[in-house]
A protein has these predicted regions:
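N-terminal alpha-helical interaction modules that lie
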Residues: 1-191, 195, 257, 264-294
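Short coil/turn linkers that connect adjacent helices within long alpha-helical scaffolds
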Residues: 88, 198, 202-206, 245-252
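Amphipathic alpha-helical protein-interaction segments enriched in hydrophobic
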Residues: 94-100, 206-221, 255-263
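Amphipathic alpha-helical interface segments used for dimerization/assembly
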Residues: 109, 219-222, 240, 262, ...
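Histidine/cysteine- and/or acidic
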Residues: 145, 244-261
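Extended serine/threonine-enriched, polar tracts that run as long, contiguous segments within proteins
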Residues: 180, 184, 188-235
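TPR/TPR-like (Sel1-like) alpha-helical repeat modules
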Residues: 232-245
Length: 294
């Protein structure tokens, strides 16, 4: 969560900075800050809850997942419609806006991608098996033998027919499809991260908090969503090198941010490596984020 904490700190600071000249932009930034704080708490809860469950037991917290996707959707819309078109004159805000857009799409990839690429995705078969619309009774799972029927319901005679399943080749629709289309968000998210990295490299020095925030989340994205452990470790390693090579002066606050994020990047350099520093299965997702990340 350290990367998010840096983003939230700059959101508040930059919103106050532009408030006098552009009150509309400031109000939108404060709204995004509120969304980001709520989204951070929800994603942490979802990840912890998923890790606590047995691997064979699907996550049943549909409302939590729907809220996560809704918050990310609203944040992305505010950025694309109001913030990004107005950030041309603000260096730090431009980097932050493009980074946050990538972050919101990172959420879509984690929780609402089709096909699923993480264990937290709503559209995984296990999650869909127990996903229910709030207010309706959930289906009961008969210990892996199929969906159990209520004992007090009479079976439907075959002559009268019954519920019609989807045609062959068409699986059940994602429970969150009414919020966001169930499509592959991975290419879009990857391109947005590349764009944010390029802008950060162009406008900010190597030890700047926002540049480190961009690189830290990009490394996490490469590992847990793209499943490219080697690329993730390379980004982490190169970013640490850029910090040590930077000659620009920084204040105490930025120094503390740099120390925290470099420590996280140091751990990310070792993700996917065995005890003898040999690569394990590429990009294996064990359901846990690196320390300091959601």
């Amino acid at each position: 969560m350290a990367s998010l904490e840096v983003d939230q700190k700059y959101l508040g600071k930059l919103a106050k900075t532009v408030e006098a000249d552009n009150p509309l932009l400031a109000s939108i930034l404060f709204k995004i800050l509120g969304l980001s704080i709520n989204l951070s708490a929800h994603t942490v809860k979802a990840r912890k809850q998923r890790r606590l469950e047995h691997t064979s037991r699907p996550n049943q917290s549909l409302e939590l997942y729907l809220h996560i996707i809704w918050l990310a959707r609203e944040g992305a819309l505010l950025l694309e419609q109001y913030v990004i078109p107005m950030v041309g004159l603000y260096v730090e805000l431009k980097v932050l806006a493009y980074k946050l857009r990538a972050s919101f799409y990172h959420i879509f990839v984690q929780f609402h991608n089709h096909p699923p690429v993480t264990k937290w995705d709503l559209s995984t078969p296990e999650t869909q098996a127990t996903a229910t619309v709030p207010g309706l009774a959930p289906q009961r799972i008969d210990k892996g033998k199929g969906i159990a029927k209520d004992d007090d319901l009479d079976p439907v005679p075959s002559s009268e027919g019954g519920p019609v399943g989807p045609p062959p080749g068409f699986g059940p629709e994602s429970p969150a499809a009414f919020l966001m289309p169930a499509v592959d968000y991975l290419p879009h998210a990857h391109n947005y991260f590349k764009e944010a990295v390029a802008i950060a490299d162009q406008l900010l020095w190597g030890s700047h908090s926002l540049r480190l925030s961009v690189k830290t989340e990009y490394a996490a994205f490469l590992y847990e969503c793209v499943h490219d452990a080697e690329a993730s470790r390379t980004v982490a390693k190169n970013t640490i090198g850029e910090v040590y090579d930077a000659t620009e002066g920084i204040d105490n606050d930025m120094f503390n941010d740099a120390c925290t994020l470099v420590a996280i990047l140091g751990k990310m350099m070792k993700r996917g490596l065995g005890s003898n520093n040999t690569a394990e299965a590429t990009g294996t997702d064990n359901g846990a984020a690196p320390p300091g990340m959601i």
